[in-house]
Design a protein with these regions (language model features):
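Basic, amphipathic alpha-helical recognition segments used for DNA target recognition
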Residues: 1-22, 82-85, 148, 153-211
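Short, solvent-exposed loop/turn positions at domain surfaces
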Residues: 4, 43, 126-127
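Non-catalytic DNA-recognition/assembly elements of restriction-modification systems
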Residues: 17, 25, 70-92, 206
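Hydrophobic structural patches
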Residues: 31-42, 70, 217-228
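Short amphipathic coiled-coil heptad-repeat segments
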Residues: 37-79, 233-262
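Sequence-specific dsDNA recognition surfaces
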Residues: 83-98, 105-135, 153-154
Length: 262
């Protein structure tokens, strides 16, 4: 149907000759209203997600800086070097000849491509394990884009694009997310944006001395993350439902029952 030599397109005449399944006007209005209602739900969910994210950002600003203290906690916070409070493992890439997609060995986390929605994902495995991270560790990107933070829920081999950080609770995980932008300042000026083990270990962190206070703060923020994730999941399901409805309603596969009144 396309015409032309180098630049292809559909002519006005051919466009007019395309046959489309068209219902009566009442059914058209009913279909349009049904899809508009779903669009309204998606928009409402998007607004709710944005609101929850803004609330979480404000909460992080209050709780992770000590500006707002939780009831029952009054001990002064202290400044510590990251290297003094956490176990840090810098990644080392195995030889590519050991990479595989058959899940032989351990999953391989090499960089940002292996991180999605703050979680490590499995794209490939390696039968040669150089440096290892463990279920629950924090994953920090050390190459551009520098400083992206995630967690892993499985043991893995880590390549040179990331480091693994072990800390006994999720306070540090949330703190590093809160301070993500700091890493880009450290990497400025280098030929290839990256941070090294010394820069990571020397990062100063102000945190509660009381581990219970750390855990309570982490729980509050993790609960907010769970609420946001639930809304995002519901929104994704609604968007998928709309696609299915369009496939059914706009092709005539499924017909709506339209009242006889105008």
């Amino acid at each position: 149907m396309a015409t032309g030599l180098k630049v292809y397109g559909i002519s006005k005449k051919n466009l007019k000759n395309i046959l489309l399944p068209v219902p009566g006007k009442k059914e058209q209005r009913a279909i349009a209203q049904t899809l508009s209602d779903v669009d309204g739900l998606i928009a409402a969910l998007d607004r709710a997600i944005a609101k929850k994210r803004n609330i979480k950002t404000a909460t992080m600003q209050e709780l992770l800086t000590g500006k707002k203290r939780l009831p029952g906690f009054g001990e002064e916070w202290q400044v510590k070097r990251l290297g003094d409070i956490a176990n840090i493992t810098m990644g080392q890439s195995p030889s590519s000849q050991y990479y595989n997609s058959e899940e032989i060995g351990l999953p391989l986390i090499q960089g940002n491509a292996d991180i999605k929605n703050r979680r490590a994902v499995i794209r490939k495995s390696t039968s040669e394990v150089t440096k290892k991270c463990y279920d629950g560790d924090i994953i920090l990107s050390v190459r551009a884009p520098v400083g992206e933070v995630a967690k892993t829920n499985f043991d893995a081999c880590i390549g040179r694009g990331v480091s693994a950080i072990f800390y006994p609770n999720d306070f540090l995980y949330h703190y590093l997310i809160f301070r993500e932008g700091r890493w880009s300042k450290l990497s400025k000026g280098s030929t290839f944006d990256s941070i090294n083990s010394t820069e990571i270990k020397d990062l100063e962190i102000k945190l509660p001395v009381d581990l219970i206070e750390q855990r309570v703060i982490a729980t509050i923020l993790s609960d907010m993350d769970a609420e946001i994730a639930a809304l995002e999941k519901r929104c994704a399901k609604t968007q998928a439902m709309k696609q299915g409805m369009m496939q059914e309603l706009l092709t005539g596969k499924t017909r709506l029952i339209v009242p006889n009144h105008p």
